[in-house]
Structures are given as C-alpha cells and as structure tokens.
UniProtKB/Swiss-Prot annotation:
The gene is Twist2. Keywords: Cytoplasm, Developmental protein, Differentiation, DNA-binding, Nucleus, Repressor, Transcription, Transcription regulation. GO terms for molecular function: chromatin binding; DNA-binding transcription factor activity; protein dimerization activity; protein domain specific binding; RNA polymerase II transcription regulatory region sequence-specific DNA binding. It is found in: Nucleus; Cytoplasm. It comes from Mus musculus. Expressed at low levels in sclerotome and dermatome of somites, and in limb buds at 10.5 dpc. Accumulates predominantly in dermatome, prevertebrae and derivatives of branchial arches by 13 dpc. Also expressed near surface of embryo and in chondrogenic cells. In adult, expressed at low levels in skin, bladder, uterus, aorta and heart. Its main location: nucleus. Efficient DNA binding requires dimerization with another bHLH protein. Forms a heterodimer with TCF3/E12. Also interacts with MEF2C. The C-terminal and HLH domains are essential for transcriptional repression. InterPro entries: bHLH_dom, E-box_TF_Regulators, HLH_DNA-bd_sf, Twist2_bHLH. PROSITE patterns: BHLH. It comes from the Eukaryota. GO terms for cellular component: cytoplasm; nucleoplasm; transcription regulator complex. This is Twist-related protein 2. The lineage of its organism: Eukaryota, Metazoa, Chordata, Craniata, Vertebrata. Residues 27-37 have a biased composition (Basic residues).
Length: 160
C-alpha cells in the first residue's frame, strides 16, 4: 500500500492535479513566457515597464484592429475591381446565351479567343485581305468564333 501512495506513475500528483492538466499547464505558461520576452528586451521585467505594459497592449490591439479593418477594405476593393475586370472581359468575349462562365473558364476562353483572332489575322495576311474592323466584320468574327467553339475546340481546352 505504501508503494501505491508514493508511486511516481500515479496520474494525480500531491496537489491533486491530473497528468492531463499538468500537460496543459506548460503550454499555458509557455505562451506567457514568450509574451513577456517580447515586452522586455533582456527578459527581466522592470517595475516601470510593467506599469506601462497595459496601455501599449490595449493600443496595439486597437491598432491591430484598425489595420485589419483597413486590410479588409483594401481586399474588398481589390475583389470588386477584379470582378469588374472579369465583367468587362465577359462582354468582349463572344459567348453563347447559355454560358455562365467561372473566372477560370473566362480566362481560358479569352486565351482561346485571342489565339483564334491571331489565327484569323495570320490567314488574312496570307490572303492579303487587310479589311477594317467594322461592325459587320466584328459580327462575322463572332459568328466564326462561335462556330469554331461549337466544333469542339473549346470543350477540348476546358478539360486542361
């Protein structure tokens, strides 16, 4: 019986704390130690610094909060700008009425459209047909592109 009360393997120490609670405590204390090292340069707290530590941490929290708010505003503006750019790109690219393109599909389709236009220009240069880009020419290009796309060129590139 004496052996059971002095056993170092006991899950409860002399203060009545379980091993699980003891495992949690060093982690809790570890955080405090790391925080205190940041607040003092040499690791030893001084009475003057301890009194001032409360207000800078509150000010730091407010600063961090305002920085986070500003970052959120910037991110919202960036996202809005990106969405507007995609909307403009979707207006330029000829699409089918049933198309509801994601951003990646829009980019892939735009790249394919640019390639298509390049091929059209190359074939025009070979034929020495330098025509102006009128409304009718634009409509013909859109139609030709839609036909080209329906033939499977887009479906093959969408899988990549």
């Amino acid at each position: 019986m004496e052996e059971g009360s002095s056993s170092p393997v006991s899950p409860v120490d002399s203060l009545g704390t379980s091993e699980e609670e003891l495992e949690r405590q060093p982690k809790r204390f570890g955080r405090k130690r790391r925080y205190s090292k940041k607040s003092s340069e040499d690791g030893s707290p001084t009475p003057g610094k301890r009194g001032k530590k409360g207000s800078p941490s509150a000010q730091s929290f407010e600063e961090l909060q305002s920085q986070r708010i500003l970052a959120n505003v910037r991110e919202r503006q960036r996202t809005q700008s990106l969405n507007e750019a995609f909307a403009a790109l979707r207006k330029i690219i000829p699409t089918l009425p049933s198309d509801k393109l994601s951003k990646i599909q829009t980019l892939k389709l735009a790249a394919r459209y640019i390639d298509f236009l390049y091929q059209v220009l190359q074939s025009d240069e070979m034929d020495n047909k330098m025509t102006s880009c009128s409304y009718v020419a634009h409509e013909r290009l859109s139609y030709a592109y839609s036909v080209w796309r329906m033939e499977g060129a887009w479906s093959m590139s969408a899988s990549h």
